[in-house]
Amino acid sequence: MVKDILAPGLRVVFCGINPGLSSANTGFPFAHPANRFWKVIHLAGFTDRQLKPEEAEKLLDFRCGVTKLVDRPTVQATEVKLHGLRSGGRNLIEKIEDYQPAALAVLGKQAFEQGFSQRGIAWGKQKIAIGATMVWVLPNPSGLNRIKTEKLVEAYRELDQALIMRGL
């Protein structure tokens, strides 16, 4: 089981789609060696060094958190069913209402659209908010995603810069 890493007062909560098998086996988020999450958040400015999956709790030191839309692990996120994403979206809203981070970053456009019943969204900051929490959609850092690491870093850095501009 991969547990959430959440606390009040966070700058951002990164929301993955669901745990992969590596994460399910280790209990750490974004644990597959091909997953670029830890590298990308470091290069984008969220952490001062590249953390390892087993150091996930240290995200709190950087006022960052991690959660997921769906608890059930799969080999690929495409195996997650629509009803699981919709239910996960409702649960995620409750978590965000409880913790109220400055931003929620959902990592995947299709997962966001399905989990939040949205259509035709663009990358970046969304029009919707959850209370005072800005909602962003960023590309998923999975190694299965073909987007280049530089583009991932650019997208994540845009969020980091938006938070800095708000004094966070």
Swiss-Prot record:
GO terms for molecular function: DNA binding; pyrimidine-specific mismatch base pair DNA N-glycosylase activity; uracil DNA N-glycosylase activity. It is found in: Cytoplasm. It holds the Pfam family UDG. It comes from the Bacteria. Keywords: Cytoplasm, DNA damage, DNA excision, DNA repair, DNA-binding, Hydrolase. It is an enzyme of class 3 (hydrolase). One of its GO terms (cellular component) is cytoplasm. Excises ethenocytosine and uracil, which can arise by alkylation or deamination of cytosine, respectively, from the corresponding mispairs with guanine in ds-DNA. It is capable of hydrolyzing the carbon-nitrogen bond between the sugar-phosphate backbone of the DNA and the mispaired base. The complementary strand guanine functions in substrate recognition. Required for DNA damage lesion repair in stationary-phase cells. This is G/U mismatch-specific DNA glycosylase. The lineage of its organism: Bacteria, Pseudomonadati, Pseudomonadota, Gammaproteobacteria, Enterobacterales. The gene is mug.
